[in-house]
Amino acid sequence: MANDYLFTSESVSEGHPDKVADQISDAILDAILEQDKYSRVAAETLCNTGLVVLAGEITTTANIDYIQIARDTIKRIGYDNTDYGIDYKGCAVLVAYDKQSPDIAQGVDRAHDDNLDQGAGDQGLMFGYACDETPELMPLPIYLSHRLVERQASLRRDGRLQWLRPDAKSQVTVRYVDGKPDSIDTVVLSTQHAPDIELPALREAVIEEIIKPTLPAELIKGDIKFLVNPTGRFVIGGPQGDCGLTGRKIIVDTYGGAAPHGGGAFSGKDPSKVDRSAAYAGRYVAKNIVAAGLASRALIQVSYAIGVAEPTSVMVNTFGTGRVSDAVITKLVREHFDLRPKGIIKMLDLLRPIYEKTAAYGHFGREEPEFSWEATDKALALAEAAGVEPTARVA
């Protein structure tokens, strides 16, 4: 890659239609796990103008009011008026869940002498990533993009900008020099709004109240391009503006394009699905590698075959930043992390109802107490095994 380049990532708010769908799917998953933590859940959601469709496969002993959970989630997000795009009180909610296929279940349920030998719920490949661009060990563009739409939601909820509505999108372009963030080049923020706010007043408020307080002062160099509601009007939003679907914001959910993605979405899936659990484990592994001081960037790929517990492959790439070889780090990963599906579930304590919180503002890089995959508790052991000094980020 060139020595001096621009890189861009985007995020969306909790009121974006695809994120509404993700949050409903994960709220349903949490409700099920509260009653039956061994449930098999693949909860998909579609939301459109005045309509929510719940479909997928669920096998559980839990007794759940799916319709009420969908309405409560829409209400929490802030859609309590049809003028905003959907109204939790009046929208239709259709439920069409099947049970998990027995052909899939037999491969996942099969147990051997080792009770950690549960097979993977599907084939596939998953990635984890970490870098030293932020204290949270996340790429800076996606980190800032999340913080912008989080602040938009905060100012909407506390009433400081009463004309804000739930739907919003952000995009941040960062200039890199010698592989490190040097300055912010462009910030795009589009926010749904009440019809009576004038565009100049909206743009000034968004720049002064949302964007500028979010940007790190040391990265503000020269003139930043601020593009606020570039189309000029964003009154129609949410599920009325676009049909929302679970799993359609997988790059927003992860690393903003700074790392590859295996293609599998997260929301609505119980942790027997390696699409979710192995991606969380990949983040955990990568973050501990960087926190241990083994590298300043780390990418992990892990792959699985359906019904087979052991990964079919584990790969580590540190992009030339490693203080020991990638082969040595890969060996350490194999020794210090159990990447079998049930091993991941045990290692990260994933049978908890913790997932609705993940469904907006990123699954990674957030210091939430439930997010066990953000811990750096393996870093000291990795550093000692590799013979290097850990960084100050070990926690």
From Swiss-Prot:
Region of interest called Flexible loop, as start-end residue ranges on this chain? 100-110
Chain sites annotated for binding K(+): E44
Job description of the protein: Catalyzes the formation of S-adenosylmethionine (AdoMet) from methionine and ATP. The overall synthetic reaction is composed of two sequential steps, AdoMet formation and the subsequent tripolyphosphate hydrolysis which occurs prior to release of AdoMet from the enzyme.
The pathway to which it is assigned is: Amino-acid biosynthesis; S-adenosyl-L-methionine biosynthesis; S-adenosyl-L-methionine from L-methionine: step 1/1
Q: How is the cofactor bound?
A: Binds 2 divalent ions per subunit.
Cited HAMAP family: S_AdoMet_synth1
Q: Which CDD domains match?
A: S-AdoMet_synt (cd18079)
Needed cofactors:
Mg(2+); K(+)
Under which name does UniProt file this protein?
S-adenosylmethionine synthase
An example of a Pfam family matching this protein is S-AdoMet_synt_N
| Annotated InterPro entries | ADOMET_SYNTHASE_CS, S-AdoMet_synt_C, S-AdoMet_synt_central, S-AdoMet_synt_N, S-AdoMet_synthetase, S-AdoMet_synthetase_sfam
Q: Which GO terms describe its biological process?
A: one-carbon metabolic process; S-adenosylmethionine biosynthetic process
| A GO cellular-component term linked to this record | cytoplasm
